Amino acid sequence: MSDRGENGQARIVTVGNVRFGNDLPFVLIAGPCQIESRAHAEGVAAELHAICARLDIPLVFKASYDKANRTSVGGARGVGMERGLDILAGIRERFDIPVLTDIHDIGQCKPAAEAVDILQIPAFLCRQTDLLLAAGETGRTINVKKGQFLAPWDMRNVAAKIASTGNHNLLLTERGASFGYNTLVTDFRALPIMAQTGYPVVFDATHSVQQPGGQGTASGGDRTFAPILARAALAVGVASVFIECHPDPDRAPSDGPNMIPLDQMEETLRRLKQFDVLGKAG
């Protein structure tokens, strides 16, 4: 996908030794939904690092220290910011890979930027101007998830808010659109439309199969469709695929129905790489 922005340029965003570009080999953003413990996060990171080394796929590790938008007030939210950022910084140093986490208010921007490489704006917060500006002002790469309620062309306004800070290290993520109650669908037209901004586009395969609030006090989903949607996105052409994974998804504290079992990741990625090559051929 070679769509150019208004200035005719397709941006390449560099994060450490990883390069995001809509015409470059895809980057994997992967990890568990939330940080459950240091040992758990490091174990998942170690396995992903080994798999990606074997398959020659650039890796960014992701995990959340606080799931602030759980369906129920009783939902597990994570280990908290201070402990979570310490764990993420340790993973970055131990494996020499970029790390990503989400932020939820302007007070989290500066401390998170000191510990991680990519700050992620959750989909529900993608129009919060103060948060976007504060994130942009850190100078870190910003990954903004398109709201389930937002048209893909409206992400141009979101990108412009961050760019107004002078920060053009920006990724735009498609993660499904609301389709009635408790259901998301993926409109693959969104990928080339968002690429017209010139910024690298990410496809979030596992949240795209989420059923928000579909289990009453928790979100449901169907992980079996995530690899299928990821293959379709790579056939269109994207800079990155975002996949949440877990050693035992059915026992995960959040987003278990969507996450890919860790022991299935290598074969999943092997097939995704084939579609990436096909999508970017010629």
Curated annotation (Swiss-Prot):
Q: Which InterPro entries match?
A: Aldolase_TIM (IPR013785), DAHP1/KDSA (IPR006218), KDO8P_synthase (IPR006269)
Question: What keywords are assigned to this protein?
Answer: Cytoplasm, Lipopolysaccharide biosynthesis, Transferase
| Sections of the chain in a coiled coil | none
Catalytic activity reported: D-arabinose 5-phosphate + phosphoenolpyruvate + H2O = 3-deoxy-alpha-D-manno-2-octulosonate-8-phosphate + phosphate
Q: Where is the signal peptide?
A: none
Name the Gene3D superfamilies on file.
Aldolase class I
Instruction: Give the record's family classification.
Output: Belongs to the KdsA family.
Q: What is the protein name given in its UniProt record?
A: 2-dehydro-3-deoxyphosphooctonate aldolase
Q: Which organism is it from?
A: Granulibacter bethesdensis (strain ATCC BAA-1260 / CGDNIH1)
